[in-house]
């Protein structure tokens, strides 16, 4: 008996040893279609928990038996299975998941499978962000997303553009989208984010996507996800970029020839005198005399030609005397001067250098993953004295402490410095270099020169600029007198320097198998110090011997989120339920002071000037928002999808009795291509999906304390007094946006052609409008909820890959948007004027009327040139009693011209297109934005 037991044990042991002996070391690699190794791919023995991941070059090693099956997978690629058999080396090439139907996209408070998403969203990957070569992350959206418009407000390096998502949403309550960085609202400067740190940007455009963010997401949401470690191997990246900034948009065909400029002005003067009753000969003589006289006589103020003695400057034929030479030497008040024109545009702008350096390291060790980066950017503007420096550092750590516990943190630090010119915006003031150089005539000098033509200097070694105020041989400009924008840009100082910190942290706790609780916390702190110095030598502050201003601003945000998720799969049914709470606090603190009479411009501190301008001040702004929210997502068999969300929001910008608002959304989708009756299309149709959503959101973006009366504290003969500032309205509450979205997504021929078409409708009701009142009431206006607006349109996105081979790929993309905007209702108090059957009100050169788009131009309309060479404008004819006759006539007197509706700036079609070719790792790409239709008013050109 004992012998039998012993033999049986030996037999079992032999079988075990035999089975173990059958396992052997399998080596291999995992690569993509281009032959590049895939880092972090999972290699798993099917039916077991035994597995490994591929290394930095895609290689792997695993023990497996001949009858085992290996499953190789990686996100974005189709899984691959292979039986081990007798092989000792297995090389796998993974195919891209061209349908991308299982891609995960970032949505409100989490992620979702793209196929299950019922809303409207566009994702921009890191590769496209880096290719755009932008300093500001917002610029990476240009031309990439249907329905999104970007407008640059200045040429300052790093300046954030204005962004519109699906048109204007309000008359007074703002249009800016909400920015989310790693799940947390972000109100800091977008220029503090390094584009090289960004993994993806997702633009959410409809109520199903945005309603969980309540009021702050009413104008759309842009979600930024930063990079994290993707593989166990350490991955180090270093890149350096150099480029040149140059002026891309040139001027119109302005007159740049001094002789032609004089001739045209002479012609205008001559025609004026002829129309006043002079003979042609008399008009010719008077025009020659007054051509270079001061502005009171209709002259240009400057004579920059030398004309032979006894000869006329302009002949009877209206042409400059061919014997006249450019440049003029003269003596004025005992000093010799040489007067000649300068090229102001050439002096104002330059081709400048842009240089950027980035380094990052990432990897996983044990249960921890780490990503760290450092970046430096130096970007010089196209205008002198405009530039920026930015240093960024980021550290992200994620740690899986237990199977049920995960936590992590993500911190970003930025140090920045800007130099900018005084006025770089869209205005046409005398301090704006861009407007100045196009408006100033080609006859005017930039500098004051001595009799030899050398630029003169003052006692401090500063070049003498010509301010057109008589300092240059007594000559005075008729346009922009006592100003020189180029001098201001060179000698004045506008500097900002500061630090920004943005940090987020999270804790995930999984329990009872199907539940997960998440706590998120985010904090943002921006500190900016500004210095403004106006030079003591020239310009409007020369009499005060210069002026220095100091400013400091702190922007602090705190956001806390508590989220509970329940996820369950029962057969073909999948359900996710989310409940959450969010609180948001924003605090802004400012401090400023100004002094004049500087000892020296080099000392730009307040202690370096002696006269207190009594301009010191400070203020604090507080804003609080709290919300409770819920969402349910359901799908059946991966074909039918539904979602519903609800948020109850409170805002400190409203009276306590009206602070809470309720917002919701419903969405559904159907993947038709998965139906059995579509089986005949399986070979060429990858994906066909119908979707629709509806919902509402609020908007509270009107500033603080509009619901209560406010007062200012002033100095009244050395005593403190309060002065009424603004009238409050207790009854104001949320402006509401109701959204409808319907669309179709498609993909053909294994991803060769893909895209989507969407229709959207957004109605804004209870618009927050500012009501002007009579000045005798002691305040200028108050806010109320009145007025409606409508935006509707169609978006189209198309992607085409005509070539996809092992070593080469060619991609083409196109998007377009057609948008219509209309004010549908205004209160009777604002319908103060009737124009062409439309009721509304006038603000500056804009008419806001029922039935018209926002910002419809209302101004004088040019009618051409009269037979006498005079400019003409249209006017409404009236009879002898002043009653309108209904006829439109012309006039040469600008003051008598009538105002008319002249169109609006909203384009009929806008979007972007581009193409990229990748060959063996070398990439060539170009991208364009376009706009068809829409009007712009250029006051400088007019």
Regions found by a protein language model. Give the residues of each.
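Short, small/polar-rich motifs associated with maturation and membrane association
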Residues: 1-394, 399-402, 406-408, 414, ...
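A generic beta-sheet turn/junction motif
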Residues: 34-36, 45-47, 64-65, 363-367, ...
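Switch/connector loops and helix/strand junctions flanking conserved nucleotide-binding motifs
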Residues: 114-116, 212-214, 232-233, 246-249, ...
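A generic structural motif
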Residues: 128, 378-382, 650-652, 802-804, ...
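Extracellular/periplasmic, surface-exposed regions of secreted and cell-surface proteins
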Residues: 129-132, 168, 175-176, 182, ...
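A surface-exposed, glycine/aromatic-enriched loop/edge motif typical of exported proteins
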Residues: 251, 256-323, 414-474, 586-594, ...
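Outer-membrane beta-barrel transmembrane strand signature
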Residues: 294-295, 299, 303-362, 369-373, ...
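Extracytoplasmic gating/loop element in the C-terminal half of outer-membrane beta-barrel translocons
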Residues: 332, 651, 867, 931-942
């Amino acid at each position: 008996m004992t012998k039998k037991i012993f033999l049986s044990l030996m037999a079992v042991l032999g079988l075990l040893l035999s089975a173990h002996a059958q396992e052997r070391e399998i080596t291999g690699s995992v690569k993509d279609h281009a032959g590049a190794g895939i880092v972090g791919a999972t290699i798993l023995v099917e039916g077991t928990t035994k597995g490994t991941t591929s290394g930095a070059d895609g290689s792997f090693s695993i023990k497996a038996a001949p009858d085992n099956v290996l499953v190789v997978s990686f996100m974005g690629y189709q899984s691959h299975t292979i039986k081990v058999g007798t092989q000792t080396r297995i090389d796998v090439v993974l195919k891209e998941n061209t349908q991308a139907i299982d891609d995960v996209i970032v949505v409100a408070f989490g992620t979702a499978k793209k196929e299950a998403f019922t809303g409207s969203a566009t994702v921009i990957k890191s590769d496209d962000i880096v290719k755009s070569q932008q300093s500001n992350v917002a610029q990476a959206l240009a031309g990439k997303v249907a329905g999104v418009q970007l407008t640059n407000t200045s040429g300052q390096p790093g300046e954030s553009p204005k962004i519109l998502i699906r048109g204007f949403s309000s008359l007074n309550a703002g249009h800016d989208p909400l920015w989310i960085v790693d799940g947390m609202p972000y109100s800091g400067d977008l220029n503090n984010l390094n584009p090289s740190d960004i993994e993806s940007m997702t633009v959410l455009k409809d109520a199903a996507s945005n309603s969980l963010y309540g009021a702050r997401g009413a104008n759309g949401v842009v979600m930024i996800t930063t990079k994290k470690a993707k593989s166990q191997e350490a991955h180090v990246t270093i890149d350096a970029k150099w480029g040149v900034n140059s002026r891309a948009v040139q001027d119109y065909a302005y007159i740049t020839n001094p002789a032609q400029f004089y001739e045209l002005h002479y012609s205008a003067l001559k025609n004026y005198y002829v129309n006043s009753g002079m003979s042609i000969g008399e008009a010719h003589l008077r025009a020659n005399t007054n051509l270079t006289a001061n502005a009171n006589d209709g002259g240009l103020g400057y004579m920059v030609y030398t004309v032979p003695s006894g000869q006329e400057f302009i002949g009877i034929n209206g042409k400059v005397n061919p014997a006249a030479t450019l440049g003029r030497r003269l003596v004025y008040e005992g000093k010799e001067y040489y007067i000649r024109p300068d090229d102001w545009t050439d002096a104002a702008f330059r081709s400048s250098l842009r240089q950027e350096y980035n380094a990052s390291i990432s990897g996983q060790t044990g249960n921890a993953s780490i990503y760290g980066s450092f970046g430096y950017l130096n970007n010089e503007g196209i205008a002198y004295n405009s530039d920026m420096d930015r240093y960024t550092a980021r550290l992200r750590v994620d740690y899986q402490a237990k199977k049920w516990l995960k936590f992590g943190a993500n911190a970003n630090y930025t140090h920045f410095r800007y130099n900018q010119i005084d006025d770089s915006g869209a205005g046409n003031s005398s301090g704006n270099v861009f407007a100045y150089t196009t408006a100033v005539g080609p006859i005017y000098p930039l500098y004051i020169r001595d009799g030899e033509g050398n630029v003169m200097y003052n006692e401090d070694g500063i070049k003498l600029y010509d301010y057109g105020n008589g300092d240059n041989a007594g000559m005075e400009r008729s346009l922009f007198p006592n100003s020189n924008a180029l001098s201001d840009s060179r000698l004045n100082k506008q500097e900002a320097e500061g630090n920004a910190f943005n940090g987020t942290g999270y804790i995930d706790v999984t329990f009872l198998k199907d539940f997960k609780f998440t706590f998120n916390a985010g904090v943002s702190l921006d500190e900016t110090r500004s210095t403004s110095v106006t030079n003591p030598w020239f310009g409007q502050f020369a009499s005060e011997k210069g002026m220095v201003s100091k400013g400091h601003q702190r922007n602090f945000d705190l956001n806390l989120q508590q989220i509970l998720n329940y996820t369950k799969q029962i057969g073909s049914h999948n359900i996710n339920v989310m409940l959450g709470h969010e609180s948001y606090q924003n605090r802004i603190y400012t401090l400023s002071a100004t002094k004049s009479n500087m000892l020296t411009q080099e000392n730009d501190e307040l202690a370096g000037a002696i006269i207190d301008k009594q301009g010191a001040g400070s203020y604090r702004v507080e804003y609080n928002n709290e919300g409770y929210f819920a969402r349910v997502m359901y799908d059946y068999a991966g074909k039918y999808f539904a979602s519903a969300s609800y948020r109850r929001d409170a805002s400190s910008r409203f009276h306590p009795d009206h602070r809470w608002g309720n917002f919701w959304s419903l969405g559904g989708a159907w993947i038709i291509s998965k139906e059995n009756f579509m089986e005949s299309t399986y070979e060429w149709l990858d994906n066909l999906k119908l979707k629709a959503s509806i919902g509402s959101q609020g908007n509270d973006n009107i500033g603080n304390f509009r619901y209560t009366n406010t007062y200012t504290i002033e100095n009244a003969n050395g005593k403190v007094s309060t002065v009424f500032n603004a009238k409050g309205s207790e009854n104001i509450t949320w402006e509401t946006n109701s959204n409808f979205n319907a669309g179709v997504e498609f993909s053909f021929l294994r991803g060769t052609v893909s895209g989507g078409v969407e229709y959207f409708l957004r109605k804004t009701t209870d618009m927050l409008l500012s009501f002007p009142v009579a000045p005798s009431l002691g305040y200028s206006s108050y806010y109320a909820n009145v007025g409606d607006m409508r935006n509707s349109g169609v978006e189209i996105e198309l992607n085409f890959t005509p070539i996809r081979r092992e070593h080469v790929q060619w991609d083409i993309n196109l998007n377009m948007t057609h948008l219509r905007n209309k004010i549908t209702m205004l209160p009777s108090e604002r319908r103060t004027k009737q124009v062409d059957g439309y009721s509304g009100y006038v603000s500056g050169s804009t008419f806001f009327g029922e039935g018209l788009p926002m910002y419809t131009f209302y101004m004088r309309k040019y009618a051409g040139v009269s037979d006498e060479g005079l400019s003409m404008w249209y006017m409404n004819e009236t009879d002898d009693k002043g009653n309108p006759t209904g006829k439109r006539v012309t006039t040469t007197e600008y003051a008598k011209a009538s105002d008319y509706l002249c169109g609006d700036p909203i384009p009929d079609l806008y979007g972007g297109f581009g193409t990229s070719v990748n060959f063996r790792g070398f990439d060539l790409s170009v991208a364009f934005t376009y706009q068809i239709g829409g009007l712009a008013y250029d006051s400088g050109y007019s």
